Amino acid sequence: MALRGSHRLDDFIRRCSALTLFHSQAPSRRVSHCGRDRRQQQDPPGQGRQEQQESGGGHWSRFGWRSLIRFFVPFSLGAVASSLVIKREELTPTITAKAMSGRRRDFNFIADVVAGCADSVVYIEIKDTRHFDYFSGQPITASNGSGFIIEQNGLILTNAHVVINKPHTMVQVRLSDGRTFPATIEDVDQTSDLATLRIQVSNLSVMRLGKSSTLRSGEWVVALGSPLALSNTVTAGVISSTQRASQELGLRNRDINYLQTDAAITFGNSGGPLVNLDGEAIGVNSMKVTAGISFAIPIDYVKVFLERAAERRKKGAAYKTGYPVKRYMGITMLTLTPDILFELKSRSQNMPSNLTHGVLVWKVIVGSPAHSGGLQPGDIVTHINKKEIKNSSDVYDALADNSKHLDIVILRGVKQMHVTITPEDP
């Protein structure tokens, strides 16, 4: 484009050189066409008019070309610059799947799944109404998680542990387009770790629900969510097992066969969808034990929860089940069964070889008693108040005790440590 603009300018100058712009009575001075020959000579008598016609006139030949160039060169450069801006925008075009060719078109099945369902995934923030940011004056974020829209009128599905057991908090939902809305908790089932939220907005993109009963080990799946508050994050993997019983995981009072996957699921992924290659949710991301071992609640189990919740809402009552409210510590935990311990020891050299039981601290809520006391994700609880901890039920029993403080023995890597926590009363 720059060469084309320069060629047009040269052509214009050559055309102008053939015109007689005006006649001068003064003796003409010959100036070479390219401006390189500046020899000045007196014209012979009778040849002034002819030379003026050839050169374009006396005064114009002295001053006109410079003015012409000063005017048209910036004009030409401006045209070139504008053309370069257009070309720059074309450097990052939006490419649709149909426009792709070769292996990109044939094997980008993960991208096709994400394009079809990412708009229905939301980011959930739990705001602490007692603590405010110094600069903005807004409540600080105590924890976060994910969810996905299941009804166009604003019904959102997530994990119960994402939104409950946090006193003095409010729930806020951010959509994929950046809009943010306050949310109300409608239905909670702590036994299955499921909950629904409602935001006051309509015409939303909805996630289609599939069938987890048809899944096979080895199937490709995609986990969507907001790990570490990074919205719309995508990880992929396969189904490792479709029948991982809750008893194997040491989960209290639950009768669920979890989906095990090697798709990366972290704290912010909790509550987000686990999606098959048809773009259907076949599970709700629930927990991660270690790299390559994560679990999701099967969508068939979720459908039962949603049906019961819908029936209760028709009767004008929310669907809430779960454990009696106990003192609040602020952790999400997982019992270390022999199978899980074997996997952890095979993947990490920081795991004590003589460890036979305990409870893994999977998540610590910011600002909670556990956070203030020094517990960290990845810690393994072995004793509370000198009592041996073998599973998560032992931790619940310790919370039900009347002890004001909990003296907790943990393993952080291979190092044994003591932390003291003061649980909050309900």
UniProtKB/Swiss-Prot annotation:
The chain crosses the membrane at residues 68-86. Residues 30-59 are annotated as: Disordered. Residues 1-30 form a transit peptide. CDD domains: cpPDZ_HtrA-like (cd06785). Residues 31-78 form a propeptide. Gene3D superfamilies: 2.30.42.10, 2.40.10.120. The active site is at residues 161, 193, 270. One of its GO terms (molecular function) is serine-type endopeptidase activity. GO terms for biological process: apoptotic process; ectopic germ cell programmed cell death; mitochondrion organization; positive regulation of apoptotic process; proteolysis; spermatogenesis. Interacts with th/DIAP1 (via BIR 2 domain). This is Serine protease HTRA2, mitochondrial. It comes from Drosophila ananassae. The lineage of its organism: Eukaryota, Metazoa, Ecdysozoa, Arthropoda, Hexapoda.
